[in-house]
Amino acid sequence: MKMHMKHLDLYSQAIKTLRWTQPMRALSTVNTSSGVQGNLSPAAPAPEPDKLYSKLEIELRGIDPAVLKSYTWFATTAAEHLGIEKGKCWSPRKAHHERMTLLKSVHIYKKHRVQYEVRTHFRYMNFHKLTGSTLDTFLEYIERNLPEGVALQASRTELQEIPEHLRQPPEQV
């Protein structure tokens, strides 16, 4: 656990320094080589605005509930360090059981059978009010640290602007 916290602290410090040490781009430049001073050339086009997401729902599947619980703690702690609003974290009480019945001998003795059972445990986590860059960084970080035997499925809900034709009420005839 201490190892995870150490890596998490280093990761959050790296993100904070990356935010503030990116080079500034000039909005316009002055061209003085042609003899005429004051010619302004336009700068590079402005970057696209970051997408906004209202909710990120993560579903974890695994065979060991203790590993799922530990990984949930790890992911929520990482979200707190990145400033992501944590929602509800929960798991169903019962696991999903899958049973297979096979014959002990392939050719004879139908009375002698063996049963195998696989139990799949689920865990759900919700996070709210994310930007696109924060969401990508967070998902990449938790996917890289996903333990063996655990499957992760993420579904995101994007916020979009209301179309122009729906903003104005219809005119009365």
Swiss-Prot record:
GO biological process: mitochondrial translation
Localization of this protein: Mitochondrion
GO molecular function, one term: structural constituent of ribosome
Pfam short name (any one): Ribosomal_S10
This protein's record includes keyword Ribonucleoprotein: yes
Gene3D superfamilies: Ribosomal protein S10 domain
Superkingdom as given in the UniProt entry: Eukaryota
Chief location: mitochondrion
Keyword line: Mitochondrion, Ribonucleoprotein, Ribosomal protein
GO cellular component, one term: mitochondrion
Secretion signal span: none
Family per record: Belongs to the universal ribosomal protein uS10 family.
The protein's assembly and partners: Component of the mitochondrial ribosome small subunit (28S) which comprises a 12S rRNA and about 30 distinct proteins.
Record's protein name: Small ribosomal subunit protein uS10m
Lineage: Eukaryota, Metazoa, Ecdysozoa, Arthropoda, Hexapoda
